[in-house]
Amino acid sequence: MSIVTHRIKEYAALLADAEKTGVGTNPLTSIDPNLSVTEAYHIQLENIQMKVEQGLIIVGKKIGLTSLAMQKLLGVDEPDYGHLLNNMEVANGGTIPIEKVLQPKVEAELAFVLKKDLMGPNITTLDVLQATDYIVPALEIVDSRVKDWKIKLPDTIADNASSGFYVLGDKKAKVDEINLELLGMVLSKNDEIVNTGVGAAALGNPATCVAWLANKLSEFGISLKAGEVILSGALSAAADAKAGDTFSARFAHLGQVSVHF
Amino acid sequence: MATVEYKEIAKYLIAGEEEKREVVKVTENIKPDLSVEEGYLVQQELVKIKLEEGRRIVGPKMGLTSKAKMQQMNVNEPIYGYVFDYMLIENGGRVQLQDMIHPKVEAEIAFVIGEDIEGPNVTAADVLSKTEYVIPALELIDSRYVNFQFTLPDVIADNASTSRVVFGTSFQKPDKFDLDLVGVTLSINGVIKELGAGAAVLGHPAEAIAMLANMLSRKGEKVRKGDVILSGAITSAILLEKGDVVTGRFDGLGEVSFVVTD
């Protein structure tokens, strides 16, 4: 056990260093081909704990690998998740200094804010919809501390599910005001459309992703908390970002959210 | 080339459609230098033959309206063809594979035109103000060419691969929506296979109709009141198989479905 813990600390430090120095690490799975998904979550938790000890606050979760395309790409059949910290939020229309990211990509998503806690297992999509306070549009800036995004499933999980920053829109909707499955989205980069998407791109329904998360977290004895922000998964493929780029996503019924690099 | 030759090519393509068999593309040996303009001349002859046979035009349809397809075909303008009355399938109805060659399905928004729209310089806003209703639709494309492979003039000559259309029956006023943000899923047997939003069509489906009106104006033609026009695919096309139950769901516009039989 102590050996495992030592390994986990060592790998967590590799990722923390990459984040600090801005130089991507080699994939952990190239260093340790046997690294398991569970170990990877422990590496993630190790780094999150370090940040919390430094004074950062956990404000929510993000769900990744929610599209069939992404799951196929990584050869997996379930999503993954990461933690959102208070220093990851950027105001709508705000700017992200390019030196704060390594190799950013932008995705448009729906974010959930719950009005009551959800503790798995056996949480259903219906439970999520009943527990949802409101839904708000979001941009997620994913980033990888692994060189050239050469990630396998344990690599991205250990790296906080490749989280970077997130931006929330200003317009909120209650569950009865929108059809989550069919809610359309257009993602533009520098005023050119790069992608269109729809809610169903995230496991058929974004609320189903949140239910998955509640159940997955219960394996670690964690619940989803009222007031937390939950990024439910990308509605379209991610678009590469570089300095000078402005991204903007328009959502049916939910307005617009944008960010500049 | 003389009109009679365009007519011969049109007959060659109609034979493929009616006999449900692939034909070698026109540019392979019949006429390797067929131009886009000539492609439309062939299409014009094809339309004329069908009208003479007593078929009725339901409306034009737009093709190659997605960025991906336009890049693939190396063009900067979409194409159009015509939907005829015999191509319509009832919502919830059956499509027989034996009636077609290698059909694919895609989801689209259709415009029911309330007033004539005459180019040039027609904008998407003009189109919306002259649109009576929008309705959801599934289009079955079925290129008459071997392996669905063709050049741009070939596909234009082949009436833009038009084969069958299933229109939804819930009519909505266009000003109730941001049509570019209408989300769409296309499912086969209950499993979502393709999805997208209206903006996949030239940024906005009404933009496709505006381009159509402007393209038609070059020939002294216009979009007509009463036309029901397919604005272009929101999703990628899916090859159909026997037994498929195909369902398109459109945010706020409802659902369209059909079943594929032998």
Question: For each predicted feature, which ranges?
Answer:
Chain A
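Catalytic-core "active-site belt" of small-molecule-metabolizing enzymes
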Residues: S2-L203, T246, L254-F261
